[in-house]
Amino acid sequence: MSLASPVGALTRTKITACVSAANTAAATSAWTAAGAYEGEVAVEISVGIITGTLDLTFNTNDAASDTGATAIVPLGGALAQVTTANDDAIYTAVFPATALRGYIKVIGTVGTGPSLIAYTLIGRKKY
């Protein structure tokens, strides 16, 4: 595989560092700039061992603000709820870059924490 391959052209941006999230506030990311991407953009969700449940949803906005934000559903539909039966895994949510309004936010709703999680944005930049 050469560095000119499609995989070599991908950019990875850390949305959150690995965190033990005891509640929804701790499992929800800040707004991350996503306007410089083309094609499809993926959010990779790394989940360690959890003690309850974790529901993942996504918002997009044209500013890094909750005001005016709208929910966005990944291609293929919403992600399945993470439980103790399917934790310790990597999940991927894929979005058309054109559907993102410039920023993306991951909302992790924790039902009985903690949940060990990390989020990464992966895509090809336009420039």
PLM features: residue spans?
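Surface-exposed, low-hydrophobicity beta-strand/loop segments enriched in small/polar/acidic residues
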Residues: 1-127
